[in-house]
UniProtKB/Swiss-Prot annotation:
GO terms for cellular component: cytoplasm. This is Leucyl/phenylalanyl-tRNA--protein transferase. Pfam families: Leu_Phe_trans (PF03588). The lineage of its organism: Bacteria, Pseudomonadati, Thermodesulfobacteriota, Desulfovibrionia, Desulfovibrionales. HAMAP family: Leu_Phe_trans. NCBIfam families: aat. Transmembrane segments: none annotated. The gene is aat. Belongs to the L/F-transferase family. Its main location: cytoplasm. It catalyses: N-terminal L-lysyl-[protein] + L-leucyl-tRNA(Leu) = N-terminal L-leucyl-L-lysyl-[protein] + tRNA(Leu) + H(+); N-terminal L-arginyl-[protein] + L-leucyl-tRNA(Leu) = N-terminal L-leucyl-L-arginyl-[protein] + tRNA(Leu) + H(+); L-phenylalanyl-tRNA(Phe) + an N-terminal L-alpha-aminoacyl-[protein] = an N-terminal L-phenylalanyl-L-alpha-aminoacyl-[protein] + tRNA(Phe).
Amino acid sequence: MRLYLLPDDACIFPDVGEAGPDGLLAIGGDLTPERLLRAYEEGIFPWYGPGDPILWWSPDPRCVLPLDALHVPRRLMRTVRAKTFEVRLDTAFADVLEQCAATPRPGQGGTWLVPEMRAAYTRLHHLGHAHSVEAWYGGRLVGGLYGVALGGGFFGESMFHAMPDASKVAFVWLARLLVSWGFRFVDCQQTTSHMLRFGAVEMPRTDFLACLHDATRQPSRIGRWRLPQDFVPW
């Protein structure tokens, strides 16, 4: 397997077809906003653990939720309709990152959200490209997720919950909002049973790249996101 070393002075990536069987494509570079946005445009994302160099991935197949195939399980929709949680956008981005980083993940000895990753996504948030969706209960943040928006694609990064269904409710609000805004898909990156229940599929990389190309031709919704006053996700 060939592993590419990225230069520090140019935001370039090798062709994703050069990725290894596990999706690993390249090593090194940096986490500047320019490089991160270029990576997402090309179907690549960073993922590495404490003490590791920056690793860049483009798995094949790719877990993707086409938003026209969104399915909300009936029991979960009852929870959404019950309004147990107040859902907000972009009001506690740093707190969502902190909680995602603190959440234990099966098979991982430590968090992949190392401090430099949190700083990088915080910069993207301040530039209006990264967003948080938060579930609140009694004035307390109890669940949420964050990701990057580019054109008509949303690239989900991580989620957490401190109460049952909190992150799932936040995701339903996000997905329905993205549909109303004309987004095409949510990139789930890694396959999970949780996302498959929402209608996600394992998409061949070539098909994902075609969807990505079409989606990134749409204008990006840059800036702080707010829920439309009359929006409901049902």
